[in-house]
Structure formats: C-alpha cells, structure tokens
Regions:
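Extended hydrophobic leader/signal-anchor segments used for secretion and membrane insertion
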Residues: 2-200
Length: 200
C-alpha cells in the first residue's frame, strides 16, 4: 500500500498578507480614535481651555478669561507650599518652574480685605466661607500645618485663594496669601459636572 503524501497549503504569503492587513487596520483605527483627542488638545491650547480633573473644583473644562474680575486663578505655588504639594503629589507634572502643574483655585480675598482665620474656618470681611477650616492631616492622614489663627489684612500685590468646594483643598488655609505675580491666568467655567467630594 502506497502512502500518499499531501503537501501542506502555502499559507506563508497569505498569512503574512493577512497579518499585515490586520496590523494596518489596527493602526488606522488607532489613528482615527486618537485624532479627536489630539485635535482637542491642540484646540484647547490655542483657545486657552484647561481640563480640571482635580477634586478642588468641579471637574470639567475651564477657559481663559481676559477679565481680572474672573475669580478663578491658575498659579504656581512657591516656597514650602510648592515643595509639599509636589512631594505629596497634590500636583502632577506641569509647566511651573519646579516642574509641577499649576493649581486652580478661587481667589476670595483681595488687597485691603480683612481675613479672619479661626479653628472653625475662614471669614472674609466677616462672611464665613464653607469648608474652609484648616485640617490637621490630609486625606491620607499625613500631617498638615494650618495657617495660624488671627486677623489679617490682605496686602497689596497678594490674594488669598480658598476652595469651598472641597474641605481637603490645599490652598491659603495652609500657606496664606499668594503673590499676584505667581498667577498665570484667570479662568471661568466652560463646561463642568458636579461630583460628590468627601468633606470633613
């Protein structure tokens, strides 16, 4: 009885072609899906749009405002505040001189305003700011040093920045006034969505 030898089908060329074809489709779809994101980032950079994903303010998009009356300010912290916020990763990598990202906070007190710091929170010209009390530790139980209690008059060339949206916000309740020269730009909300923020 003779054994019949059957030649295996020639799949090399076809398989190679199909592999290249699938790879090409994958690259194409990746480019198509990434294009809107890239275009969005470019448009955001051109039109001054910032995406906020931090819990200090409602998450969403904010746009640059050329009006100094816009109370949301983007600034680079200085001194100990810059070091702590970077070491503890309150800030990501960004464009500030220390290599960290700018902070986005509401400016709540301006030159000439009276700031009263107490254990229960902060008052601006007698008006109490919700969720403004300094905490003894952060959300990971690392120690914090709140700004000393007392009455302060906001000096020329400085502002106080405090977020009432989140009691864990790292702002002037820990480092006092910031120099106006550290402000990079003013912003206003463009499109935001409310999120539940843990309070203490």
């Amino acid at each position: 009885m003779r054994t019949r030898l059957v030649k295996p089908p020639k799949l090399t060329a076809t398989g190679s072609y199909e592999t290249r074809n699938r790879f090409g489709h994958a690259v194409l779809w990746t480019c198509l899906l990434a294009a809107p994101l890239v275009l969005g980032l470019i448009a955001g950079w051109l039109f001054g749009i910032r995406l906020n994903l931090t819990p200090s303010l409602p998450r969403g998009f904010y746009i640059t405002s050329h009006s100094s009356a816009a109370n949301l300010v983007e600034f680079c912290p200085q001194g100990a505040a810059a070091s702590i916020s970077l070491i503890r990763q309150y800030r990501s990598v960004g464009a500030c001189p220390d290599g960290g990202a700018p902070l986005l906070k509401p400016a709540v007190a301006f030159p000439g305003d009276k700031v009263q710091v107490a254990a229960d929170g902060i008052r601006i010209n007698g008006e109490f700011l919700p969720n403004s009390a300094g905490l003894s530790d952060d959300h990971l139980q690392r120690p914090l040093d709140p700004w000393p209690s007392g009455a302060y008059r906001v000096e020329q060339g400085t502002v106080w920045v405090i977020s009432s949206f989140n009691s864990f916000s790292f702002d002037s309740r820990y480092y006092g006034a910031i120099p106006i020269t550290s402000i990079r730009r003013h912003l206003r909300p463009l499109w935001t969505f409310a999120t539940e923020v843990p309070q203490r």
